[in-house]
Amino acid sequence: MRRPFRATPVQKDGPRSNRDIRVPRVQLIDAEGQNHGDVSIQEAMAMAEEAGLDLVEIVPNAEPPVCKIVDLGKLKYQNQKKAAEARKKQKTVEIKEIKMRPNIDTHDYEVKMKAAQRFFEEGDKVKVTLRFRGREMAHQELGMKLLQRVKEDTVEIAKVESEPKLEGRQMMMVLAPR
């Protein structure tokens, strides 16, 4: 015999309001922001109905809980706007990659370093990748010297997040802005 389907109870998001508030007494703040002190829940509900608004629990952990008479829809909308604004202001840190060869020319090196400096100013991490081709693998010390030079040139604006290491035919190092 099958068990009957039982739906999971719906979890309400946001603060408790109106009949969901199950405490005998609350500290009440009305729509104008005036504190009415410690009142019974029935009295608070009556005042909220009289104003045509909702009784919303603002600070549930207080003793007694702090409730405010506000429009619940408006409160939820304002909270959503605040959350969206906070998400918009968050900066995601990207890892930008700069590719070089061990026998890079001085001007090319300077151009790459200017690009790295711009990335650090924008708050991004930089992954410096050195690619070895053919017989260049026999001279890995040149690559190590070049990465040490990059580290020394960016010491004021960046810190080394991962030291230079060889992976296959590539040597790489990650720098993060200070």
From Swiss-Prot:
GO terms for biological process: ribosome disassembly. The keyword Protein biosynthesis applies. Keywords: Cytoplasm, Initiation factor, Protein biosynthesis. Disulfide bonds: none annotated. InterPro entries: T_IF-3_C_sf (IPR036788), T_IF-3_N_sf (IPR036787), Translation_initiation_fac_3 (IPR001288), Translation_initiation_fac_3_C (IPR019815), Translation_initiation_fac_3_N (IPR019814). GO terms for cellular component: cytosol; membrane. GO terms for molecular function: ribosome binding; translation initiation factor activity. The keyword Ribonucleoprotein does not apply. It is found in: Cytoplasm. Belongs to the IF-3 family. IF-3 binds to the 30S ribosomal subunit and shifts the equilibrium between 70S ribosomes and their 50S and 30S subunits in favor of the free subunits, thus enhancing the availability of 30S subunits on which protein synthesis initiation begins. This is Translation initiation factor IF-3. The gene is infC.
